[in-house]
Curated annotation (Swiss-Prot):
This is Lysosomal protective protein. Glycans are attached at residues 140, 327. Protective protein appears to be essential for both the activity of beta-galactosidase and neuraminidase, it associates with these enzymes and exerts a protective function necessary for their stability and activity. This protein is also a carboxypeptidase and can deamidate tachykinins. One of its GO terms (molecular function) is serine-type carboxypeptidase activity. The gene is Ctsa. Disulfide bonds join 83-356, 235-251, 236-241, 276-325. SUPFAM superfamilies: alpha/beta-Hydrolases. It comes from Mus musculus. GO terms for cellular component: lysosome; mitochondrion. The lineage of its organism: Eukaryota, Metazoa, Chordata, Craniata, Vertebrata. The active site is at residues 173, 394, 451. Belongs to the peptidase S10 family.
Length: 474
């Protein structure tokens, strides 16, 4: 009846319903995470975001350790394609890092959630704990961007208290494709407070990545003079070399040899000066499972590059995809522990967690050869700060190729290339790498770091991240 007062019970129910819709989802909160000697003071959540009608992306969200209400929200995506972003959480810059025993977590003094609310999403469907109802895992760059955007929208629906916070999109490796394609969608959505993006050792251009890698390999002493001379003779003309899609038969043979040296000879493609975990990579078999260690990102135009994995899939063998020269045993053991899965609210029906998914990678359709148009669109708005950073001893996505890519965008130079410094306490300030700043886009190297910068140089990575978020000079 009009004007009738609500009963106290009904009022209480309505208030509780409203509060649930204005705050983080209680059912996703991690109450007790196995492996920690002491549970964290910050709140963390694990559950699922709706990426499409049939796709469910697993997320793990760690609130900032310092003033979460006013800290930015930072999305992190690992690459592959086909690899889990929990690699970033547990081995790079998460609040706690997995130890070699695969059981223990130790707090990370350089965790990125010291100053930000960090959202880790496993993408695309089929990766890690993410899944699709129809179990169809064929996808492509455009669909993944749309799925990531829908998942991000769902995150802000579940966590409306963060919708006005500054938003930064970040990632690594093949996230060099994921992040700018997602950013182009997000920039058109006024409900999201996008401030910028940062990509570490990202794949921005296949052509520049391949062309630069040959120079990187030669000047790091990996190619002999005979091979280098032959490359110059058969792959170059008029002072310009094409190591990307050259059709000269001798050039192709030379590039196959470069590809073998860089990726198959026992060198660590992710960090030239680090040992290769497990020894020389190749055809490893564990428990009747064949392990493949090639993501198909370098020298993609060479013949025979994809025939071996395709033949493997037809053979019916169990195949696993692992990052080369990387020991994934500890994170795999941890995330497949039934108590951990329960703490993370993972359905029992889902298969085991693997760092990377072979089928997702093999069936993935790469639609873009360059991110040039995406970055130019983002830069044309003059609203966003963009950082491309590279560990300078990575060969998978080497620093030179990404620097060439930034140069090709032809943005106005504001700060010439110079060293940037990190304070190492008793050791004093040290050169951490080099940086050059153009209008709204910065290129930065981290000296002595490989593909996974926060793993190799955690203090430098955190310093860079802090300066990026706070718009401070590097």
């Amino acid at each position: 009846m009009p004007g009738t007062a609500l009963s106290p019970l009904l009022l209480l129910l309505l208030l509780s319903w409203a509060s649930r819709n204005e705050a983080a989802p209680d059912q996703d909160e991690i109450d007790c995470l196995p492996g920690l000697a002491k549970q964290p003071s910050f709140r963390q959540y694990s559950g699922y975001l709706r990426a499409s009608d049939s796709k469910h992306f697993h997320y793990w969200f760690v609130e900032s350790q310092n003033d979460p209400k006013n800290s930015p929200v930072v999305l992190w995506l690992n690459g592959g394609p086909g690899c889990s972003s929990l690699d970033g959480l547990l081995t790079e810059h998460g609040p706690f890092l997995i130890q070699p025993d695969g059981v223990t977590l130790e707090y990370n003094p350089y965790a990125w959630n010291l100053i930000a609310n960090v959202l880790y999403i496993e993408s695309p469907a089929g990766v890690g704990f993410s899944y699709s109802d129809d179990k169809m895992y064929v996808t492509n760059d455009t669909e993944v961007a749309e799925n990531n955007y829908e998942a991000l929208k769902d995150f802000f629906r579940l966590f409306p208290e963060y919708k006005d916070n500054k938003l930064f999109l970040t990632g690594e490796s093949y996230a060099g494709i994921y992040i700018p394609t997602l950013a182009v969608l997000v920039m058109q959505d006024p409900s999201m407070n996008l401030q910028g993006l940062a990509v570490g050792n990202g794949l921005a251009s296949y052509e520049q990545n391949d062309n630069s890698l040959v120079y990187f390999a030669y000047y790091h002493g990996l190619l002999g003079n005979r091979l280098w001379t032959s490359l110059q003779t058969h792959c170059c003309a008029q002072n310009k070399c094409n190591f990307y899609d050259n059709k000269d038969p001798e050039c192709v043979n030379n590039l196959l040899e470069v590809s073998r040296i860089v990726g198959k000879s026992g060198l660590n493609i992710y960090n030239l000066y680090a040992p290769c975990a497990g020894g020389v990579p190749g055809r490893h078999r564990y428990e009747d499972t064949l392990v493949v260690q090639d993501f198909g990102n370098i020298f993609t135009r060479l013949p025979l590059k994809r025939r071996f994995p395709e033949a493997l899939m037809r053979s019916g063998d169990k195949v696993r995809l692992d990052p080369p020269c990387t020991n994934t045993t500890a994170p795999s053991n941890y995330l497949n522990n039934p108590y951990v899965r329960k703490a993370l609210h993972i359905p029992e029906s889902l298969p085991r967690w693997d760092m990377c998914n072979f089928l997702v990678n093999l069936q993935y359709r790469r639609l873009y050869q360059s991110m040039n148009s995406q970055y130019l669109k983002l830069l044309s708005s003059q609203k966003y700060q963009i950082l491309l950073y590279n560990g300078d001893v990575d060969m998978a996505c080497n620093f030179m190729g990404d620097e060439w890519f930034v140069d090709s965008l032809n943005q106005k130079m504001e700060v010439q290339r110079r060293p940037w410094l990190v304070d190492y306490g008793e050791s004093g300030e040290q050169v951490a790498g080099f940086v050059k700043e153009c209008s709204h886009i910065t290129f930065l190297t981290i000296k002595g770091a490989g593909h996974m910068v926060p793993t190799d140089k955690p203090r430098a990575a955190f310093t860079m991240f802090s300066r990026f978020l706070n718009k401070e000079p590097y």
